[in-house]
Structure formats: structure tokens, C-alpha cells
Amino acid sequence: NGHGTHITGIAASSATFGSDYLGIAPKSHIVSLKVLDASGNGVQSAFLQGLDWIHEYHRSYQIRIVNISIGSPGSEDSSASKELLKHVNALWDDGLVVCIAGGNHGPKPYSISIPGNSPKIITVGSSDDNFQMIGRKHFSSGYSGRGPTTSCVMKPDVVAPGTNIFSCSLNNRYTIKSGTSMATPVVSGSFALLLEKYPFYTNKDLSLIHI
């Protein structure tokens, strides 16, 4: 449906049609896993299968960063949510840098999407220069999910531009989209640049640097 295409372009577009459309880390190697259908909908079983695939094959494909620009607004205490968190946390324990969208159900508190509520991974919110909150500019956009989580974990961990982002679309076209899904590959791409310069950095190192 173009969601993943848009995300990939933000992170790693090689600017085939001009330098104005360069991604954050254009020389990155991309491994794409499709877990949504043509309408942009998906089921948790497909999501878990994708996470399991990364867990099994990340060394073979030299994967270091996992960008997850999907999530669920469900209850943190449900068995389905706990299962999802278990799989996401396993990727972090594998040494992977896991960046997950915080969701678009803000600005109220406790609105971080699952699995962005995990205390281990890096949860990304969306910033908007045109939105002002509590007298401060350049902070979260009005829709960006906010913490704390029900476990009192402060989220998101970092915010990045996510409103009116121009990137790749279907059929060799471009389009504008907004959301924490768009902000997440900005962070993932930035981490890719850091790992290119400092390949010995671990996911824990990067989790400290972004602060």
C-alpha cells in the first residue's frame, strides 16, 4: 500500500531522480519484511513472524538496525501485547538497534502505541515546527503519542520530523505523509550514519547517544 515504501525512502533513498530527495542514509542496505496487506492492515501473527525472521537471520544478512513503523493502541496488560513485547525485546537482546514509532494517538498521556512502550527499545515521536505546546516549539506534534506508559516509563525517547514528509510512493512516484511512522526512519537513518562512522558502537551505546 506504499507505507513501507515511504518509510524506506526516508531512511535510505538514493536520490535516483535528483539530490533533493536523498534519504538520511542513502548507502544503507535495506532488508524489507512485508507484514501488512495491500490496504495497510495486518494481524499480529504476521508481525511476530517478521520479528522471528529477523531474530533468526539478522547475522546472515548483517542487520544492525530494525525500524518498526507500525504499532497497536491496545492494552499493555493484554496477553497479545506481552507476546509482542517479548519478541521486540528479544531483538534488542540480540544486539540490534530497535527503533519503533510511538503512535499517532496523542497528545493525551498514556497514548504510546505497543510495542513502543518497551523500556528497552528506542521509541520515536514526531516533531512539528509549526506546533507549539506548553510554550515550547520544535517539540512533539499534536498527534504524537506520549507517555508515560502504565509502567511509568517515560516515552518517547526521542522526537524527529514526522509531519508533511516527502518520500517515495508506489509506481515510481512520490507523496507526502505524516506520522510517527515517518519520524522513526529519520532516527534509524541517523543511527545508520553513526554506525558507518563508528561500527563498534552497540545498541546500548546508541541508546545513550540519542539522549
Residue map of PLM features:
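Catalytic-core regions built around general acid/base machinery
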Residues: 82-98
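Hydrolase catalytic cores
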Residues: 8-11, 31-37, 66, 111-114, ...
